Amino acid sequence: MIFSQVTLQVEKTVKKKNGAEDNVIKPITLPAVKQRISQSRLDEFSMIGLGKNVRYELNGIGEMEDLIFNYFLDEKGETFKRTTWERNPKNNKMILEGLVSNGI
């Protein structure tokens, strides 16, 4: 287990004084435990396995379970695209998986 933190980039819509709407990214930092992912071998027909995948386990997030976001940052500031955000029924913790957002 590697104790770490992740910063979720939650996009919210804010109304301006003139009535216009603007999307604002609100960072939410949460404690997490980084899990190891074994990279699968390359398939001869596809390039699956080349990207950098990460998996985090978050505990006790409460009402933040229903957050809608597409990107998150790790403790080093590297941006990841969210691929999985679901509750693990075995231990009641949230699983967050992502792929490096700037490519391979």
Curated annotation (Swiss-Prot):
Keyword Nucleus: no
GO biological process, one term: symbiont genome ejection through host cell envelope, long flexible tail mechanism
Main subcellular location: virion
Domain of life: Viruses
Keywords attached to this entry: Viral capsid assembly, Viral genome ejection through host cell envelope, Viral long flexible tail ejection system, Viral penetration into host cytoplasm, Viral release from host cell, Virion, Virus entry into host cell
Gene Ontology cellular component annotations, sorted alphabetically: virion component
Subcellular location: Virion
Keyword Zinc-finger: no
Protein family (similarity comment): Belongs to the skunalikevirus head completion protein 1 family.
Function: Probable head completion protein that exhibits an open central channel for viral DNA ejection. Part of the head-tail connector by binding to the portal protein and to the head completion protein 2. Plays a role in morphogenesis of the virion capsid after genome packaging.
Protein name as it appears in the record: Probable head completion protein 1
